[in-house]
Amino acid sequence: MLPLIKQEDIKPEPDFTIQYRNKIIDTAGCIVISDSEEEQGEEVETRGATASSPSTGSGTPRVTSPTHPLSQMNHPPLPDPLGRPDEDSSSSSSSCSSASDSESESEEMKCSSGGGASVTSSHHGRGGFGGAASSSLLSCGHQSSGGASTGPRKKKSKRISELDNEKVRNIMKDKNTPFCTPNVQTRRGRVKIDEVSRMFRNTNRSLEYKNLPFTIPSMHQVLDEAIKACKTMQVNNKGIQIIYTRNHEVKSEVDAVRCRLGTMCTWPSPLPSSWSTPCP
């Protein structure tokens, strides 16, 4: 809840008056709340800098204070429930929109000068709400200046692609380049980029299963053989179905076969009756 203000704390200046419907109201401490239909469409005359007081209807009383700020006498006014735009905000938004639409410097100068005037008037008339209006005007100025000046765009640097083990080994096989044969038993499996010497070793196993242990015929060769077979058949009631798989599917099948071979028992077939064969 808002703290109560004693009447002794309110010390208005002699020129301070409250005018409502062309009648001067005594400032002994009164709050005007009106929501009648008769006040719709009527305007309230103001003198000097004006500020709206909290009300629930369309007709809002006006307070005229030439020199004394309103923030020292009363609490900040609540926002209008009908959502009507304030005079300062409407003037600042109109000036900001005009500055963003125009491209010439003269119109931008007019916008900045108009914004400064609205800031000073809101500071004298509304007291505490002057900072909000000035901040909104400053934000509008930053947006207009940022949109007008665009800096040069930097080109993206092209990164060197990583070395592919499979491509390098295939190129060396095509060129019949001899691979080095290590004298000792070496590791198998994953090959890092820094270990370039491991990529050029003469091995029968594939490095990280990237190279299959057998040669896969190309699609052109398979189609050529299928067409030749169809020509030699010379029948109309038969056909040849070509089934092909992807490289990653072939590699997965090779891994599955190797795992299956590793779980098989390598003992001789005629086992003694006293031995028991373990389950794989």
Curated annotation (Swiss-Prot):
Highest taxon of the lineage: Viruses
Composition-biased stretches (Low complexity): 47-67, 90-101, 132-147
GO terms under biological process: regulation of DNA-templated transcription
Keywords: Early protein
InterPro entries: Herpes_IE2_3
Region (Disordered), start-end ranges: 36-164
Protein name (record): 30 kDa immediate-early protein 2
Lineage of source species: Viruses, Duplodnaviria, Heunggongvirae, Peploviricota, Herviviricetes
Gene: UL122
